[in-house]
Amino acid sequence: MPHFFKLVSFLYQQYLYAKQNPVLKKLKVGEQEDVYLSAATHDTRFNTNIKGHIGNLNEMSWGFIGTGPYTLALNILYTFTGDAQFARTHAFEFRSEFLEKIDSKKSYWMPNWMISNWIIQKIEGEEIYE
């Protein structure tokens, strides 16, 4: 299948997932909305409302140490800040604190205020939970 048709197919699938489940509509860079992780959606390209802006994979997951949770952490931070360097610097730590320990078989909401506070405290160089 030519690349153009693969891209159209991918965008159409993304549209269908978002139409069937509006909370999975991909956030744009700078949109600081709640992050939704859907265990009911088995296609790891569409199981969250976070778009794969940076990194080598579109597949995003949670509940273990690996590239799926790293890619999700990287793109959550990039979506919220628009700063690729910040996202790369802090993605492992974010993954460790928020994504590794949760059950991959369950869906989750990550409130935007929790993510925003974590980012602010990293920028200011403070500990999050004192």
Predicted regions, residues:
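General structural signal for secondary-structure boundaries
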Residues: 7-8, 38-51, 106-116, 121
